[in-house]
């Protein structure tokens, strides 16, 4: 027996397809939209359609953008000799929030994951290597996540880049600011020790 009418059921099903959205959350979202005024619903649907139509990948860094090249690649005040390699566009946003990094980015749009059937050729690695051949780069900062896949991807890229005479570094991993040592796992503590620096 179907509890909801066709349009509501379809809306719930569509929301359920989103990552991290289960059936109950999909129902809450669907009913929230039903209770919104028509203008707000139309604005939401237009924003979704516009984002899908207008967002593309930057031809230089492979980040998402609505202009090509993106604003970061076309910003002459950024240091083009240092490239920070990240997994996805959300990582660029996280790095930018620190206001510490003044170089450029390269977005891989994923990591090597044989278990998920994702090989190096499915990522934006070839574009990175081409970019390094066209641009004078002194350092690549590998800022992939500290997962098995992130580490494997960083090592794979490092092996490709080192013969080009470019310095390859890895962001430090370790204890979060404000975290207690006693609650940290062994891998985190090991990474914190490896990444220690003189004060």
UniProtKB/Swiss-Prot annotation:
This is Recombination protein RecR. GO terms for molecular function: DNA binding; zinc ion binding. PROSITE patterns: TOPRIM. GO terms for biological process: DNA recombination; DNA repair. SUPFAM superfamilies: Recombination protein RecR. SMART domains: TOPRIM (SM00493). Pfam families: RecR_C, RecR_HhH, RecR_ZnF, Toprim_4. HAMAP family: RecR. Disulfide bonds: none annotated. The lineage of its organism: Bacteria, Bacillati, Bacillota, Clostridia, Peptostreptococcales. May play a role in DNA repair. It seems to be involved in an RecBC-independent recombinational process of DNA repair. It may act with RecF and RecO. Residues 81-176 form the Toprim domain. It comes from the Bacteria. A zinc finger (C4-type) spans 58-73. Keywords: DNA damage, DNA recombination, DNA repair, Metal-binding, Zinc, Zinc-finger. Belongs to the RecR family. Coiled coil: none annotated. InterPro entries: DNA_Rcmb_RecR (IPR000093), Rcmb_RecR (IPR023627), Rcmb_RecR_Znf (IPR015967), TOPRIM_dom (IPR006171), TOPRIM_RecR (IPR034137).
């Amino acid at each position: 027996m179907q509890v909801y009418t066709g349009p509501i059921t379809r809306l719930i099903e569509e929301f359920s397809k989103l990552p991290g959205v289960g059936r109950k959350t999909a129902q809450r979202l669907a009913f929230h939209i039903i209770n919104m005024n028509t203008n707000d619903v139309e604005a939401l649907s237009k924003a979704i359609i516009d984002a899908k139509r207008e967002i593309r990948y930057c031809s230089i860094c492979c980040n998402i953008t609505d202009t090509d090249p993106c604003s970061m690649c076309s910003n002459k005040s950024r240091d083009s000799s240092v490239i920070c390699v990240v997994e996805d566009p959300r990582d660029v946003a996280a790095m930018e929030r620190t206001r510490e990094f003044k170089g450029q980015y390269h977005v891989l749009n994923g990591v090597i994951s044989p278990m998920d059937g994702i090989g190096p050729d499915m990522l934006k690695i070839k574009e990175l290597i081409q970019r390094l051949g066209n641009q004078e780069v002194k350092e690549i900062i590998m800022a992939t996540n500290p997962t098995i896949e992130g580490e494997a991807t960083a090592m794979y890229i490092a092996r490709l880049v080192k013969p080009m005479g470019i310095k390859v570094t890895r962001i430090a991993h370790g204890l979060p600011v404000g975290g207690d040592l006693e609650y940290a796992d062994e891998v985190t503590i090991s990474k914190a020790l490896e990444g220690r620096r003189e004060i």
